[in-house]
Amino acid sequence: AVTADLTALGGKKDFKLDPALMEGSIAVKEGIQAGTYELPVTVKDQYENEYTGKVSVEVTERNKGTDFDWDEAVIYFAVTDRFYDGNTTNNDAYGTGDYNKDPATGSLSYHGGDFAGLTQKLDYLSDLGVNTIWITPIVANEMKKGLATDLPGTLSYGYHGYWASDFTTLNKHLGTEEEFKTLLDSAHKKGMKVMVDVVLNHAGYDTENYFNSMLNGKNMIRSGADLIEGDTKKGPLSNLPDFMTEDPDVRNLLVEWQSAWVSKYDIDYYRVDTVKHVDDTTWAAFKNALTRIDPDFKMI
């Protein structure tokens, strides 16, 4: 076990560091003065022998300005595809006929909402008193044919964003990279923040072959003895392909994909989906990666 004493920073006396990572993201309590702090670190081996040392931490001043803290956020949740169609040219972005707003036949299809639509409605949201917009996942998504709740032969599309087929590209139905950047920039000019939903637990239906080809012969998707029915972390969720996040190579690739969006765009927050279905080490690694990119970045 590895612990650090954070009392000098207003934190816990026994902050636990994950031994698989040997690093951790820490917060400083409001009122702590800027400067360099020496934090005691204790390591216990399997025989309960203790080894102690110290690590230096630099605390810098934060100029809040007109910014607001997380506990002051007024959040509006928008399923982007269902919110407002601001650019009709992306409605059938993949040429697969997956756009259908007919109430009788299109409840499981795309309806046209996009980044451009959100941008056009920022004044409306601001007038409601909203200062944080939470949007559904932005990455490319799969479709699934014949879900149990559907009519036989119907198609259900990932308009909601939770059936990822590629974590490195935007869902074209939602718009272009430029339109996404415009949404972020426009929101920030109005003093608003954007929180993006992300998934690390699973992929979209029928994507096993694609993701299993990513690690040079090592599968990313759980199968066989690794797939345990009824297990919170190692069981399937709605029969979606389940990532073996406890494997360091799988974990690192997922963290790399999802943190890259924060490196590329000025995203303010992440809302993390299916938290209880993923091991704690993966969440710690994800937090560490995001903190390295932006120390003020928040995820819930």
Task: Please provide the spans of the model-predicted regions.
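Exposed beta-strand face motif in extracellular beta-rich ectodomains
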Residues: 35-39
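C-terminal edge beta-strand
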Residues: 53-66
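Short, exposed coil/turn segments at beta-strand boundaries within extracellular/luminal domains
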Residues: 46-52
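Aromatic sugar-binding surface patches on proteins
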Residues: 18-26
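Short, surface-exposed loop/turn segments at beta-strand-coil junctions that are enriched for proline
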Residues: 27-33
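Substrate-binding/active-site clefts of carbohydrate-active enzymes
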Residues: 69-73, 81-265, 283-298
